[in-house]
Amino acid sequence: LIDNYVDESVLLMLSKRQPGVTATIYTQRITSQLRLDLDRHKDQYPPVDVWTCKFSHDRFLIVDETDVYHIGASLKDLGKKMFAFSKLDIPATVITDLFFTTFAQSKVE
């Protein structure tokens, strides 16, 4: 998930994934509240890898390293207002290669 506005509600959504399914979040910054939410989350649920990356304005969801969705608003706002999920007809590597080869990022421990 690439989303600059992650909060506890997004972590809760990710906690519903099946055993063995990994989750990675790329977000702009880790606030003190998000740090607290991440610490609480990892005590109760399977881990979520979190990276900071300041080079994305839009939100994307990559599923199974193949399907790419462009999301019109932060997942934290799901159900609050109308916004679109659009499946993009591009390989996931178009997005992931930018993150791993072009843009610098830092893993959050």
Predicted features and spans:
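PLD/PLD-like phosphodiesterase catalytic module centered on the HKD motif
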Residues: 2-109
